[in-house]
């Protein structure tokens, strides 16, 4: 699971995003680009992505070929016979491409095992969508409690314990921490 999550959230995601912005006109408005620049700490340049679209499509194809090979043993889902977080992590990348960048869909369709797996995930469904505002979403998150029992790790190298204030940020391209 963890290794596949690293692949889906970094390598596959970056290939998918590059294809989306490299093959789709007008998807990113000025506010979105500024938000991404703040997140990544570097300029967001859709024109460069468009210029690199052919190479980016090859990168996506290579990742999908690898996924296709993984599924070639006829397993139903990525980790075996049951769905899991790995399937969700991989699927959202393909859904993102299909929803926004039809040019990328053609590459997905060439991978027969991926297409069959994708159909099995689609058959599960997406649940019921509900629009939430930022404040409402934050209130729900604040009111949520964990099902995991609190514990202190005696080997925690920084002496952190439940209730301590921490900053959380991405460990890849994201640069804006959340306190």
Predicted segments — roles?
Residues 1-36, 154-162, 166-179:
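GST-like domain detector, emphasizing the conserved glutathione-binding G-site
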Residues 8-123:
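GST-like fold's C-terminal all-alpha helical module
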Residues 63, 144-145, 168-170:
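Intrinsically disordered, low-complexity segments enriched in polar/charged residues with Gly/Pro
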Residues 82, 93, 134-138, 146, ...:
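Histidine- and/or cysteine-centered catalytic micro-motif in compact active-site loops
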Residues 130-162:
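Mixed-charge, Lys/Arg-rich low-complexity intrinsically disordered regions
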């Amino acid at each position: 699971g963890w290794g596949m999550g690293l692949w889906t959230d970094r390598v596959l995601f970056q290939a998918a995003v590059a294809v989306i912005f490299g093959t789709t006109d007008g998807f990113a408005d000025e506010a979105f680009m500024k938000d991404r620049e703040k997140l990544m700490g570097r300029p967001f340049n859709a024109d460069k992505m468009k210029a690199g679209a052919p190479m980016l499509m090859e990168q996506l194809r290579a990742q999908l070929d690898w996924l296709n090979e993984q599924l070639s043993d006829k397993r139903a889902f990525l980790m075996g016979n049951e769905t899991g977080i790995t399937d969700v992590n991989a699927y959202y990348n393909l859904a993102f491409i299909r929803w926004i960048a039809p040019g990328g869909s053609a590459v997905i369709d060439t991978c027969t095992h991926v297409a069959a797996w994708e159909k099995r995930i689609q058959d599960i469904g997406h649940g019921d969508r509900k629009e939430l505002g930022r404040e409402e979403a934050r209130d729900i998150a604040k009111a949520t409690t964990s099902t995991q029992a609190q514990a202190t790790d005696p080997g925690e190298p920084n002496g952190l314990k439940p209730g301590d204030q921490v900053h959380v940020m991405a460990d890849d391209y994201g640069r804006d921490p959340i306190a």
